[in-house]
Structures are given as C-alpha cells and as structure tokens.
Amino acid sequence: MADSQPITPGQVSFLLGVIPVFIAWIYSEFLEYKRSSLHSKVHSDNNLVELGEVKNKEDEGVVLLEGGLPRSVSTKFYNSPIKTNLIRFLTLEDSFLIENRATLRAMAEFGAILFYFYISDRTSLLGESKKNYNRDLFLFLYCLLIIVSAMTSLKKHNDKSPITGKSILYLNRHQTEEWKGWMQVLFLMYHYFAAAEIYNAIRVFIAAYVWMTGFGNFSYYYIRKDFSLARFTQMMWRLNLFVAFSCIILNNDYMLYYICPMHTLFTLMVYGALGIFSRYNEIPSVMALKIASCFLVVIVMWEIPGVFEIFWSPLTFLLGYTDPAKPELPLLHEWHFRSGLDRYIWIIGMIYAYFHPTVERWMEKLEECDAKRKMSIKTSIIAISSFVGYLWYEYIYKLDKVTYNKYHPYTSWIPITVYICLRNSTQQLRNFSMTLFAWLGKITLETYISQFHIWLRSNVPNGQPKWLLCIIPEYPMLNFMLVTAIYVLVSHRLFELTNTLKSVFIPTKDDKRLLHNVLAGAAISFCLYLTSLILLQIPH
C-alpha cells in the first residue's frame, strides 16, 4: 500500500490556490440559486404577460453563452485589468462571481479531479492488486471492442479536401483520430495487463504518435502560416497544463510522463523549422534545406557521443528523472533513451505532410482512371505494401526488445508507411472511420497521464505504475469495468476542462493581454510557493 509521504511546497501551493477557488465557486452557485429563485417568484406574478413583454425587450440585447452567462460579461472580464479582476475575486464581489461562475466551476472541477488522483495513488483509501497477463483475455477484450465499435460507430464521411475540393480524404482528420484511438487502447491495455510480448508494437505506436506531431503541426503551419504567440501558447497549454499540475500534486518529475516532453520538443522543432524565414516556405529548395537541417540537428544531437549530454545538462532540473527502482542510472538517461527512439520519425511526418497535396492529386487522378487500370494499380500498391510489411515483421519486429530498440529509430517509418498505404488504398476505406476510436483518439493525452494514477498505481513519487487500482477486491473483471469507466470519464472531462480554461486564459488575438496573463500567473504562483515555504517552516 501507499506509504506516507512528506507534504511538498508545491502541494501546499496548490491547496492555497484551489481552496479560495472552491469557496468562490460554491458562493457563486449560491448567488445564482438566489437570483434564479427571485426570478421565478417575479414570473409567478399575475402580471405575467406584461413582465414577459418587458423581458423580451431586455433579451434582445443579451445573448446567452454556455453556462447561462451573457456575452457582455465575457467581454467585461477580458476588458478589465487583471489587478481589478483579482481584487474582485478575493473580495468575493457578487457580480464578478456570477459573471464567472462557469470558469470557477471549471477550475474547481479541475482541482477536484487532481485531488482524486492523489487519493487514488498516494493514500490507502483505495486498494491495489497485481497485474496479470492472459493472452486470450487480452485479445478477447480488444477484438470485442473493435466489433462493438464497427457495429455501432462506423460512419461515412464526405468532407471536401481543401487542396483538391474533392472527397479524396487521404489521411483525413477522422482517420488519424481513429488511428490514435485504436493504438491508444492497445497501449493502455499493454500497461494494464503487463503484455510484455507486444513491447515492439508499442514502440511503433509511440513512433506513430510522434509522426503525427510532425505531420499535423507541419500541415497547420505550412497551410495557415499562423506563427502567432497565441497559437504557440495554446499548443504549450494543451501539451503541458495537465501534466504540470500532475507533477505538482503527486511530486513527480516531468519525465515520468515522457510522452509530454517528447511531443513538446518535436512540436517546438517543427515550429522553429517552419517559423524561421517563414516567408520562404513556398520555395521547394528552401523547404528541402529546412528538412535537411532538421536531419542534421538530429544527427549531431543523438548520433555524436557526448553532444546530447552537453546540450541538455542545463535542463536537468526539468528533464532529469530517477526511477526509484533504478537509482543508479544517470538523471538524463530516460530523456536520452525516450527522445532518441523517435528522433527521426517527426521529420518523416513533416515530409509526408509536405507531399500530402501532391499525393492527393495523384489519388484523384487514380480515381478517374478506367476500372481495369485503377484496379491493377491499387492491387500493386496493396501487394507491395503487404510484402514490405511482412519483411519488416520477419526481420525487424521479431527481434528481442534490446536489439529491436537499436533498429527502431531507423525503421519505424516502415510499418507506419505500410499502414498508411493499406488504410488509404481504396476510396471506400478512406470514406469510413469508427467514431468510437476517433473519440478516444481525441483524449489520448489525458488517458496517457491519467492511467498512472486512477487506473494503475505507483504509490511513490516517480514510481512506475506496477499495480492496478482496486475498488472491488476479489472481482478483477468487475473492478476493471468500474475503474475503466471512471478513468475514461475523468479523462474526457479533463480534455474539456483544459480547452475551457484555455479559452479563458489564452486570448487568441491580444498578445499584450496574453503576456499580462502569463506574468500574472507567474507572480501568483511565486507568491503561493513563497507562502507555502513559510508555512512549512512553522513547527508542528
């Protein structure tokens, strides 16, 4: 069971920040209840018709948003100085609390979920059980999910391509979300059941996620040319808000959740590659030079011994990690190993994104060919892809874990390319996707982080999740059903809350306001942390 751990300054800071938010939110709900009750009494008056006419006139100037908040309130919040908003919050001003009730609710719910993380992973209130792998059960559950998803959520899409204006749908958003979803399910089940025999497949799945980072970010920046501070901040918020609070609450290192720093790094590299001299991105030779430069950076960083350690050692405080089970390893070992496995695949994603319009035009021409020629070309593509996939499986995938990892950085593009070719080989395959997996694909970041603490258990700071969370002892399948339902629900809520709070604190067209918000957030965090240090010095 979980051992008692000393409370940290970060945890005290979180409590100091979240308790006032909870109080303000509860009070705002009380104020809203009073206002609604008064409103109901007024409308129960005998002069209902007259009052209704007056109300209709008043409502002409008010447009309600989600949560029952008028649009003018949101404008007032953004137009008010941060200092003014903070004073109104601390003094529990009625109008301010009612105006921002939805935001306070989102912040309070976010805090409550993090508290549940701590309860589940670091206390003895909930139990734990050992992992147990059974191949038959593992395959049964996954195949059952595929069958149910195919029967209930298979959907045809008719989206038009922004490049050709036709429904080619090559590597469309529905397809990539579905791809992320079915991979994520296997990735999570691999952890839950300790399915060590599919380790090499999991490595390919993680490479595919990184490939999508290169593909998706390149597509966005290349097409929309939006290198604004707001867009950059939104990306960093999406990737790191949840994980940052998880590290604070559970006293974990950032590298425990290695997917987050990996995606952050490769997102930054794509942003830098396209953002530098962005006005020349339309010139093919310039783009070729940029991609070649990316390869050069990776080669120098990861292939030349000693360079990685020299470059990253100043960031050891952020990227260092010590596994309690392997304390003898260097602090940067985990970062070197994890980032090195997928050091090239993000560039492959960029290349595929760059040639995406060209391939789409080829596919459009292919669909316009006569039936015999079209069939022969598609059959050839499927046959070649299948043969290449078979060779990779026989000579690379079947290698032992340690040997496979040596080949992985140079070969992970092969199964990814094979899957893309097969998945997009016909118009019918491109038209359809399973929306259940696509839905799961949208919350991969949340499910990845949450699994450590409310699906599995680690019990100690920086510990790997070696146990299962147990709410129903002696009934492993019932327990699996319950904790999975809670886990997926919480992950989805975290996805929604992250986006809700992003819209509140990250202005999209006001860099000055954004900078003020960042500075205010840093100042508040510093004050809370300083206060927590003082409180922890008080003798118990």
Curated annotation (Swiss-Prot):
Entry annotated with the keyword Transcription regulation: no
Subcellular location, principal: Golgi
Disulfide bond positions: none
Modified residues (Phosphoserine): S44
A matching Pfam family: Cas1_AcylT
Entry comment describing in which tissues the protein is expressed: Expressed in cells undergoing secondary wall thickeningin a SND1-dependent manner, such as xylem cells and interfascicular fibers. Mostly expressed in the middle and bottom parts of the inflorescence stems. Mainly observed in the more mature parts of inflorescence stems, but present ubiquitously.
GO CC list: Golgi apparatus; Golgi membrane
Membrane topology: Multi-pass membrane protein
GO biological processes: plant-type secondary cell wall biogenesis; xylan acetylation; xylan biosynthetic process; xylan metabolic process
Signal peptide feature range: none
Function: Probable O-acetyltransferase involved in the acetylation of xylan during secondary wall biosynthesis.
Protein's UniProt name: Protein REDUCED WALL ACETYLATION 3
Name of the encoding gene: RWA3
